[in-house]
């Protein structure tokens, strides 16, 4: 029976023989999701969604619950690992032209938006200083929506300010959204295996495919082992590496932190938001920074799918990576002279990539045709 099952996996899932390690991040994301749901479930057992008890319940989990510190740290560090994997996954998609499989790319972008919402709700739950103020600042952006803004914000808060109903509904949303992520991931995987994955060359893989098991399965397991090893190393040697010191203080609506900022994985979008000195403009730029990814399948102009053979576009791609990193860095800094200009310049450069990429593809086609 076991041999029959193995044969089924081998025969039903042929995969291109030349896909590199960059194609392993899908399975790493699946591992992260399982890890987050498992640890999240055990944390939810001991967590109390009440503004007076939430902070104390997190301390109780860390100090008193057997292995609670492992659950709490794995969940917090696991979220950062999740975003490292997803950003690498997206970067690989942009570099190798995976976005040309439109249905897979658009379902993946939807997944990213749901994941960011889930992570934001989760960041509010410990009810520390930064949790409270990040929630206040980000949810306040909804008031920029013409006509409906104030109504939508009041509805989300469950009152006229962030209070107990807000925390309760954020906990409910943080609990339910991962199950929507599982459903969306299933759709994402079904759509992917409908046509099959692309490869580093950007050519059709049909002529040279090998069974997923054992070749790619062992490759996946190697990467999963490395990721879990990294997780355990961070958890044991630097458990607060990704934490904000402000969040070790209980939320106080009367004291504003000197510098309000979300978790590191939102800093690029937050940096773009801050660079525009207008509330509605900043909010639009924030949403556009993620939604703009959906335009890439429709603006691809090059005859070549992958950037592996397009040196000019490679320069543009690595400029985007440098820009992303710089925006993230400036968002950690206070809003003052050098950082304001740097974030404005890098924000323009970030959006310029999505305009320059099709233009450069068109120019490369012209160069190739004239050779």
UniProtKB/Swiss-Prot annotation:
<dbReference type="InterPro" id="IPR016174">
    <property type="entry name" value="Di-haem_cyt_TM"/>
</dbReference>
<protein>
    <recommendedName>
        <fullName>Cytochrome b</fullName>
    </recommendedName>
</protein>
<dbReference type="InterPro" id="IPR005797">
    <property type="entry name" value="Cyt_b/b6_N"/>
</dbReference>
<keyword id="KW-0349">Heme</keyword>
<keyword id="KW-0830">Ubiquinone</keyword>
<dbReference type="Pfam" id="PF00032">
    <property type="entry name" value="Cytochrom_B_C"/>
</dbReference>
<dbReference type="InterPro" id="IPR048259">
    <property type="entry name" value="Cytochrome_b_N_euk/bac"/>
</dbReference>
<keyword id="KW-0679">Respiratory chain</keyword>
<keyword id="KW-0408">Iron</keyword>
<feature type="binding site" description="axial binding residue">
    <location>
        <position position="174"/>
    </location>
    <ligand>
        <name>heme b b562</name>
    </ligand>
</feature>
<keyword id="KW-0813">Transport</keyword>
<dbReference type="InterPro" id="IPR036150">
    <property type="entry name" value="Cyt_b/b6_C_sf"/>
</dbReference>
<feature type="binding site" description="axial binding residue">
    <location>
        <position position="188"/>
    </location>
    <ligand>
        <name>heme b b566</name>
    </ligand>
</feature>
<keyword id="KW-0249">Electron transport</keyword>
<feature type="transmembrane region" description="Helical">
    <location>
        <begin position="69"/>
        <end position="90"/>
    </location>
</feature>
<keyword id="KW-1133">Transmembrane helix</keyword>
<dbReference type="InterPro" id="IPR005798">
    <property type="entry name" value="Cyt_b/b6_C"/>
</dbReference>
<dbReference type="GO" id="GO:0005743">
    <property type="term" value="C:mitochondrial inner membrane"/>
</dbReference>
<keyword id="KW-0812">Transmembrane</keyword>
<dbReference type="InterPro" id="IPR030689">
    <property type="entry name" value="Cytochrome_b"/>
</dbReference>
<comment type="similarity">
    <text>Belongs to the cytochrome b family.</text>
</comment>
<dbReference type="InterPro" id="IPR048260">
    <property type="entry name" value="Cytochrome_b_C_euk/bac"/>
</dbReference>
<comment type="subunit">
    <text>The cytochrome bc1 complex contains 3 respiratory subunits (MT-CYB, CYC1 and UQCRFS1), 2 core proteins (UQCRC1 and UQCRC2) and probably 6 low-molecular weight proteins.</text>
</comment>
<feature type="transmembrane region" description="Helical">
    <location>
        <begin position="105"/>
        <end position="125"/>
    </location>
</feature>
<keyword id="KW-0496">Mitochondrion</keyword>
<dbReference type="GO" id="GO:0046872">
    <property type="term" value="F:metal ion binding"/>
</dbReference>
<feature type="transmembrane region" description="Helical">
    <location>
        <begin position="25"/>
        <end position="45"/>
    </location>
</feature>
<keyword id="KW-0472">Membrane</keyword>
<keyword id="KW-0999">Mitochondrion inner membrane</keyword>
<dbReference type="InterPro" id="IPR027387">
    <property type="entry name" value="Cytb/b6-like_sf"/>
</dbReference>
<dbReference type="GO" id="GO:0006122">
    <property type="term" value="P:mitochondrial electron transport, ubiquinol to cytochrome c"/>
</dbReference>
<dbReference type="GO" id="GO:0045275">
    <property type="term" value="C:respiratory chain complex III"/>
</dbReference>
<comment type="function">
    <text>Component of the ubiquinol-cytochrome c reductase complex (complex III or cytochrome b-c1 complex) that is part of the mitochondrial respiratory chain. The b-c1 complex mediates electron transfer from ubiquinol to cytochrome c. Contributes to the generation of a proton gradient across the mitochondrial membrane that is then used for ATP synthesis.</text>
</comment>
<feature type="binding site">
    <location>
        <position position="193"/>
    </location>
    <ligand>
        <name>a ubiquinone</name>
    </ligand>
</feature>
<feature type="binding site" description="axial binding residue">
    <location>
        <position position="89"/>
    </location>
    <ligand>
        <name>heme b b566</name>
    </ligand>
</feature>
<feature type="transmembrane region" description="Helical">
    <location>
        <begin position="339"/>
        <end position="358"/>
    </location>
</feature>
<feature type="transmembrane region" description="Helical">
    <location>
        <begin position="280"/>
        <end position="300"/>
    </location>
</feature>
<feature type="transmembrane region" description="Helical">
    <location>
        <begin position="312"/>
        <end position="332"/>
    </location>
</feature>
<dbReference type="GO" id="GO:0008121">
    <property type="term" value="F:ubiquinol-cytochrome-c reductase activity"/>
</dbReference>
<feature type="transmembrane region" description="Helical">
    <location>
        <begin position="170"/>
        <end position="190"/>
    </location>
</feature>
<feature type="binding site" description="axial binding residue">
    <location>
        <position position="75"/>
    </location>
    <ligand>
        <name>heme b b562</name>
    </ligand>
</feature>
<feature type="transmembrane region" description="Helical">
    <location>
        <begin position="218"/>
        <end position="238"/>
    </location>
</feature>
């Amino acid at each position: 029976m076991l041999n029959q099952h193995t044969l089924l996996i081998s025969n039903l899932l042929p995969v291109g023989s030349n896909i590199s390690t960059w194609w392993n991040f899908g399975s790493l994301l699946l591992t992260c999701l399982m890890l987050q749901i498992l640890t999240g479930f055990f944390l939810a057992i001991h967590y109390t969604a009440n503004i007076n008890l939430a902070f104390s319940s997190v301390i109780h989990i860390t100090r008193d619950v057997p292995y609670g510190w492992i659950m709490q740290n794995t969940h917090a560090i696991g979220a950062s690992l999740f975003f490292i994997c997803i950003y690498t996954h997206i970067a690989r998609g942009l570099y190798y032209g995976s976005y040309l499989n439109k249905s897979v790319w658009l379902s993946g972008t939807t997944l990213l938006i749901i994941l960011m919402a889930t992570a934001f709700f989760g960041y509010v739950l410990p009810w520390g200083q930064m949790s409270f103020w990040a929630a206040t600042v980000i949810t306040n952006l909804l008031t920029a929506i013409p006509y409906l803004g104030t109504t939508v914000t009041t509805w989300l808060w469950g009152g006229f300010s962030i209070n107990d109903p807000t925390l309760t509904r954020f906990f409910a949303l943080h609990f339910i959204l991962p199950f929507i992520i599982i459903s969306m991931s299933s759709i994402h995987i079904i759509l992917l295996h409908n046509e099959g994955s692309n490869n580093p060359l950007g050519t059709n893989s049909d002529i040279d495919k090998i069974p997923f098991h054992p070749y790619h399965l062992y490759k996946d397991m190697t990467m999963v082992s490395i990721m879990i090893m990294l997780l355990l190393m961070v958890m044991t040697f630097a458990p607060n590496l990704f934490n904000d010191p402000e969040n070790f203080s209980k939320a106080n609506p009367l004291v504003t932190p000197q510098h309000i900022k979300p978790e590191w994985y939102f800093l690029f979008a937050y940096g773009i938001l801050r660079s525009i000195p207008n509330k509605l403009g900043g909010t639009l730029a924030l949403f556009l920074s993620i939604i703009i990814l959906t335009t890439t399948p429709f603006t691809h102009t090059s005859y070549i799918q992958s950037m592996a053979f397009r040196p000019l576009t490679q320069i543009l791609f690595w400029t985007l990576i440098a820009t992303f990193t710089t925006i993230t860095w400036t968002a950690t800094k206070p809003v003052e002279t050098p950082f304001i200009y740097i974030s404005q310049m890098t924000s323009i450069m970030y959006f310029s990539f999505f305009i320059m990429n099709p233009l450069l593809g068109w120019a490369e086609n012209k160069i190739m045709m004239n050779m």
